[in-house]
Amino acid sequence: MINYSYPFKNDKEWNKFWACFDDIKETGIIDVKSNALINNKFCKARVYYITAKFTRKWKKIKPDNDTYTFQIGEHDNTNGHFINCDLTEFFAMNNLCPWQHSSYWASSSSVDSERRKEIHYPTVEKSDVDCWSNLWNMVKGLRMYDGKSLESMNMKDHWDVKKMHWVGPFAIGHLKGLKEFEDYHQSKFLDFIPDRDGSTGQNKVIFSDGNYAALMGHPSMTCTHKGEYFGFKPEKKQPRIYVMDFWTCDGDKLIDNWCQIDMIDLFRSINKEYEEFIDDKLHYTG
């Protein structure tokens, strides 16, 4: 059984979604396999894109014959088989979810109001040079956040600050360089959930494969909604945040990071009005 991101409950619903599209093309990006057994299983993961033209009605969404790009992460590990599909370009263009595009968020490479989702290929070739120590040091750095300063995490020690690509959900953007990542995602995310604790996540797995690596958390962390996020005021709720990460590393620096966040379910978990709105549009129950 595959565990899908919102709103797909099973293979049948997943396949019905794609039956509403034509000119479907899958583009593989990276495949990662653990180099050791994890709980008696070799774990594997991949990130890929599907581009397709929306030509038939899906739920209450009418076809527009536009072509959309979906970034998809997949993990098959000791916790099960999981697929996390970013729907936020498709939803944003149909006025179904918030996304960063106002003048306040303006940035030429990530949050341009005219932007569309693009495929990002690895900028680092695969090699056998193990990236585990650098990856794990970066994760430990994230856990050092003091609640005040991004510098407390020392991310500049782990990332190539100029060549870095953080390829997130369309709603957030493709962020280039450490400064853009901090300005347009990390600072906003930590204002949103300053008490986030990744060590308490469930179904967690992280592994490297040479200079490539992958992580999954389902959910990835425990946290409290304490700051405004995408216009949603804090209600002290416990957000559901399902995450997959895929990395490349060049020497001792991380470079590419495809980050899957189930943004629609995250929004649902922090705002009852949005949950009722999107569930109605998608005929979703449960």
How would you describe each model-predicted region?
Residues 1-286:
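C-terminal and inter-domain tail/linker signature
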